[in-house]
Amino acid sequence: MKATHTFRLIYFLSIQFAHSQVFEVGDYISDLVGNICENGNDDWKFSFDENKKVLFISSFATWWKPCQSEAQTIEEIYKQFKDKDVEVMGAGIDWNQPYSCKEWAKKFQLTFPILDDSKGRQIYNYFGDGIVPYNVVIDRSGKLIYSDSGFKKQDIVNAIESGFKTPKTDSVYLKKKNPKSDNKTRYQILRKNKGYD
């Protein structure tokens, strides 16, 4: 019995360690890419130097009740900011448990683009801490200004509004780093520097 509890604790801690976020508030992000599975084109690329928008991404799992509860609130945020320089994205993992991407959008009447993040889990692994829902806001320069699990609508709205205060200039990340490097390289460097690899 004691060995079982020890195994469960070790397993839980290893899962938490494996899902430690790579990017933290204050880090600069370059381009993000993904596949849109609903409410948009197939391929999505967000470049802070080109788009110069605030980006809000919510990472979720379809089977988790808190993610289901927040879906309509994200739609409200999307409608509140859709005519401003804000891009709102959902990033789903674990599709078909119980909803497919299309069923998710239909069930919760969502009109913002939804990424299929289940294969590479780029969004989930870059920003999350192993807990969903996980929400991030990145300002117009590519700086991560909000990163938190759970759902705190007013904090997210405040972060989005704060993101507008950043001037529309070239990303500091790209000025400081090699423009040919990508997030995968940055991801590997950060993991190594933090002792994960």
Where are these regions (language model features)?
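Conserved segment of the thioredoxin-like fold in thiol-based oxidoreductases
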Residues: 72, 79-122, 129-132
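Short pre-active-site segment immediately N-terminal to redox-active cysteine/selenocysteine motifs
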Residues: 53-55, 59-63, 131
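Non-globular targeting/processing and membrane-anchoring segments
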Residues: 21-36, 165-197
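Bacterial Sec-dependent N-terminal signal peptides
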Residues: 1-24
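Hydrophobic beta-strand anchors of alpha/beta hydrolase catalytic cores
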Residues: 56-57, 88, 135
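Thiol/disulfide oxidoreductase modules built on the thioredoxin-like
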Residues: 107-110, 118-162
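Conserved redox-active cysteine motifs that mediate thiol-disulfide chemistry
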Residues: 59-76
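A short beta-strand-turn-helix
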Residues: 31-54
